[in-house]
């Protein structure tokens, strides 16, 4: 399944040369140095997680069933204040083990100690867009901006081009006008995209109304942001029709995080209205500290079901559209759609083999329905990024999973002790 617009699934071969797809088509039957026989399997583009906080895998299940602000202020921020660069490194590796196992090949990450995440990405062999999250409520904003700049200088284009960097003002409610303008200015100067949370809860909308007399979207729009740079907006749950109009024509788009939104009771993002206005939508998990899973197959289902339920219309967000969101949609949000997101000659070989030899994946009336509504991450047999096999026959080849699990248990226990 190439995910190229209008191209039907076919039985065939994919020939890789180096990091790229050289040829793809029905039964090419070419000689090769190495052959993966994939009878009964389906090849598709790697999944793109368009928004998350990878080291929060260490906080999975530590604090559930709370409102967003209580969860963040009372639980996550105190645990994060204890995180060392080494904790972040091992938390990111834990997340990457889960992502590779469930077919994610690229992800957009916003967090702290980003140098350690970059090292982990380099070693794991994944593709990532990395962002130093910028919260400006305390007075060390200058140090954070310097860290964002250092990250860009050291890692943009790094790991053989698999790493790119964005500038990350965290959210309208944590970024007053002056530092927000500085962050946007930095992005413009470095020609980098912006990655920012937007309008996740009704409370956020009320806070912005009280502080600035504007919706969160109006607040960002007023800076000229959407005309100036490529923007990755995470969540965008509470947007009015007018807000959606303000985003029309933007470069970048929206990372929809349906499982996180469901679990935190945030609301249903107006995804169908956004796509109706021509906005690009991708899918993200958010951190495992809120969503508890990094399996994008869960997000595909949740995204489709939420739109169908919210609009009381089973035709809303059909299977193929959800699959396009999690592949080429995410690639567009990360600014790498020229490299990945579809299977076609010349693009990077970022792809998965999904094992269809399972009772819950038979019979094959519709591959797109099976993938969107019946498959899960454990059905992924093989994950390949830039032509390198990261998982084969469900065995991780670039990560030491036993060591990662050991490090994660010890470090997670220390982070949450007494909180
Ligand atoms: C400063 S790094 C990023 C920062 O974001 C926090 N975070 C995680 N999930 C969410 C969410 O759903 N909304 C807002 N902020 C979130 C994370 O804990 C880090 O502190
Ligand atoms: Zn987030």
Spans of features found by a protein language model:
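His/Asp/Glu-enriched, well-ordered alpha-helical/loop segment
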Residues: 222-228, 272-358, 374-376
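N-terminal metal-binding scaffold of metallo-dependent hydrolase/deaminase domains
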Residues: 1-31, 42
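Alpha-helical scaffold segments that flank or form the walls of functional sites
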Residues: 60-126, 147-158, 409-413, 417
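C-terminal cap of metal-dependent C-N hydrolases
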Residues: 2, 348-405
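Metal-coordinating catalytic core of metallo-dependent amide/deamination hydrolases
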Residues: 116-238, 242
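Divalent metal-coordination and catalytic microenvironments
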Residues: 14, 19, 40, 51, ...
